[in-house]
Amino acid sequence: MGGHYMKSVLFVGHGSRDPEGNDREFISTMKHDWDASILVETCFLEFERPNVSQGIDTCVAKGAQDVVVIPIMLLPAGHSKIHIPAAIDEAKEKYPHVNFVYGRPIGVHEEALEILKTRLQESGENLETPAEDTAVIVLGRGGSDPDANSDLYKITRLLWEKTNYKIVETSFMGVTAPLIDEGVERCLKLGAKKVVILPYFLFTGVLIKRLEEMVKQYKMQHENIEFKLAGYFGFHPKLQTILKERAEEGLEGEVKMNCDTCQYRLGIMEHIDHHHHHDHDHDHDHGHHHHDHHHDHHEDKVGELK
C-alpha cells in the first residue's frame, strides 16, 4: 500500500449550492495542527466533490488502515444517521481489511453554547444584564428527526441557564413547528419589546438570505418592536476544538453513541410504510436488533483502534 499513514480522519462537510455557503475553506483549516502520522482528508455530502465514497477511497489509497469519519453537522439528523452510514457500509464491503469508525456530530456541546453566547455579544447584547423585555429566538433549520429537533430545545434551555434573559425561545426555519413566525408571535405575547434572532446554522447559504428578508418584514409589521439578527453560528475557531474532540474520540475508540440514533435508522422504513403510529413506544428489541444489523461499524471496530 505504501504511505506511512495508518490512521486517517475524514471530515464530511454538507456542501452547498451557494458558493458563499461553502464550508471548504473552513474544512481545509482542519488539516493543520495534527499529529503528522494522521492523514486528514475532507469530503462533502452533496453539491460538491469529493463525495463521501471518494473521500474514503483517498484515505485507503494513501494507506489508511483505520478511517474515522466525522460529520461536520450541528445536530444528528437524516444525513448523519442514514446517508453517511450507508456510504460507510459500502466501504466496509469494498475494503474488508480497513477499520471504519463513525464519529458523532457536534451535538449538544459546551463550546457550541460558548459560540452562541459570542454571537449574541457581537450583536451588542449584554448577557449578564439584558433588558427584561428582550427575547432571544434560537433558530434551527428544522427537520423530520425528533432527536435533532429536541436537541435544539436542549441547547435553547442551556443558553437560558447560562445567560440572564427571561425569554429564550426555540423556532425552526422549516419542516417542523414552531416556525419562526410562531416564535416571534410567542415572544411578543410574552411582552418582548426587542427580539434577537440567533441562527443555529453552520454556514450562510440560502437560509440566511431568506432570514434577512424575513427580519425586514417583521420590522415593517411591528414598528414599535426592535428586531435584531445575530451572526449565524458559522465556522468559529471553537468549532475546530469540538471537531478535534470528536475525531480524537474516534481515534481512541471512545465514540459515545446515542441509542436513538440506531433506532432511527430502523424506524425510517416504518415511516415510509406509514406504520409509524403515535402509540408506539420505541420498543427496545427494535433498537438492539438494529444495533446488530446496521451499526456493526461501532460495535466491532471501535475496540480495535489502538
Swiss-Prot record:
Cofactor note: Binds 1 [4Fe-4S] cluster per dimer.
Keyword annotations of the record: 4Fe-4S, Cobalamin biosynthesis, Cobalt, Iron, Iron-sulfur, Lyase, Metal-binding
Enzyme Commission number, as recorded: 4.99.1.3
Compositionally biased region (Basic and acidic residues): 297-306
Pathway(s) the chain acts in: Cofactor biosynthesis; adenosylcobalamin biosynthesis; cob(II)yrinate a,c-diamide from sirohydrochlorin (anaerobic route): step 1/10
Residues that, per the record, bind [4Fe-4S] cluster: C259, C262
Reactions listed under catalytic activity: Co-sirohydrochlorin + 2 H(+) = sirohydrochlorin + Co(2+)
Any GO MF annotation of the entry: sirohydrochlorin cobaltochelatase activity
Similarity comment text for this entry: Belongs to the CbiX family. CbiXL subfamily.
Function noted in UniProt: Chelates cobalt to the cobalamin precursor as part of the anaerobic pathway to cobalamin biosynthesis.
Name of the molecule in the record: Sirohydrochlorin cobaltochelatase
Source organism of this protein record: Priestia megaterium
